[in-house]
């Protein structure tokens, strides 16, 4: 069996791990407002649950402020209610046709907890990478058409890919830590 076939599949799975990690990092509040903070919040809109970004335009007029302008003004109270129920730690300020969310700067203790969470996400990503690596090793070992030299080559290449991805994970976690600790 050709290593390139395995390599392509492994790289795709590694990319999925990186995407997952980036999505988890977006959820960590660094003190700056980002529309992604609202991604998991669903609004009861005429009997169906819909994400806020499908009901409103979300912008960042200031670094710590989100402005939510509903497409339908009648949904403004439903959106504010959903935000209150989401435990974001902000109170929506409802104007006539816009909702403003002002995020306070996180305290030192909160930032340290966020750094811990970022490290946990990084460790979870590394665990996922190890599982992918183990599955690939098992799959390749079961391939009876492969000669022993190819198996050793595959193992070396797989180890290199894994080390490369783990370095990338560590770099991303390090950048996120710096981002969180910046006041």
UniProtKB/Swiss-Prot annotation:
Superkingdom of origin organism: Bacteria
GO molecular function: ribosomal large subunit binding
One Gene Ontology term, aspect cellular component: cytoplasm
GO-annotated biological processes: translational termination
SUPFAM superfamilies linked to this entry: Ribosome recycling factor, RRF
Keywords, comma-separated and alphabetical: Cytoplasm, Protein biosynthesis
A UniProt-annotated Pfam family: RRF
InterPro entries, per the entry: Ribosome_recyc_fac, Ribosome_recyc_fac_dom, RRF_sf
Main location as per UniProt: cytoplasm
Keyword Protein biosynthesis: yes
Entry keyword annotation includes Protein biosynthesis: yes
Protein's cellular compartments: Cytoplasm
NCBIfam families: frr (TIGR00496)
Annotated family: Belongs to the RRF family.
Protein role: Responsible for the release of ribosomes from messenger RNA at the termination of protein biosynthesis. May increase the efficiency of translation by recycling ribosomes from one round of translation to another.
Stated name of the protein: Ribosome-recycling factor
């Amino acid at each position: 069996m050709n290593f390139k076939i395995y390599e392509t599949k492994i790289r795709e799975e590694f990319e999925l791990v990186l995407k997952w990690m980036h999505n988890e990092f977006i959820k960590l509040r660094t003190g700056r407002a980002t529309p992604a903070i609202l991604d998991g919040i669903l609004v009861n809109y005429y009997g169906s649950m819909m994400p806020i970004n499908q009901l409103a335009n979300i912008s960042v007029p200031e670094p710590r402020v989100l402005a939510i302008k509903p497409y339908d003004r009648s949904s403004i109270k439903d959106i504010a209610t959903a935000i209150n129920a989401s435990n974001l730690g902000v109170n929506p300020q409802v104007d006539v046709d816009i909702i403003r969310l002002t995020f306070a700067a996180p305290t030192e203790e909160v930032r340290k907890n966020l750094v811990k969470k970022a490290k946990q996400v990084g460790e979870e990503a590394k665990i996922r990478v190890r599982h992918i690596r183990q599955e690939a090793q098992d799959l390749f070992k079961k391939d009876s058409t492969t000669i022993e030299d190819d198996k050793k080559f595959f193992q070396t290449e797989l180890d290199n890919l894994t080390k490369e991805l783990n370095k990338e994970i560590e770099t991303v976690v390090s950048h996120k830590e710096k981002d969180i600790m910046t006041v």
